[in-house]
């Protein structure tokens, strides 16, 4: 009987939102995540994926009555970590990697906005409309779900999150649709600068982590773009490129479950290094 009560109490944690505090909690670390299809989903979940430390949270991007989610509130980050999502993505294992190493009093929260197939231009604050007007109808429908403006959707969610905690970093996975675009680093810098300004952040305190596309060692269809991505830190000083070498794929374009788990861990390890933790260092 006691075991059943404990199980019910734990289940309640998954269904009900985490209460926001009156003032932002400096030990609640928030990460903004955006991009295209690999940021959306990386493959099927297994039972182990559903075991998540209660200190890892996700802000509901949409209302999801079937999950008990209300947009703009925090929930235990059991995948899929998007109301309309499926499977897991790199963000799942990014968060898990952080909470496994950070002190017990630190929580990690993520906000995720992803539009499969989009160019980085979709997140350009002043010119996104021109871009989306020329895109395919299915993508326009996804964008409509974000109020017609995914960038502003991310900013609005982030402002809500800032009432609860502190934004510590930005995660990006995008580039397949910009393959060959040598201006991509400059475009990413523009999006980053706008986020920093619109959220009143300090650029030297908020790094951007950008992950490579499926690597050449996996015969990635867009692997050549990684040479362009490698230039990003020269354009955006507080940015870091995460290697995708060895991260597996089933179609040479999207990371599969195993690849997404490994890739997310690498994002997490890099962020821990930025926060001052050495590889293998315990809490």
Predicted regions and their residues:
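Cell-envelope and extracellular/periplasmic
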Residues: 23-283
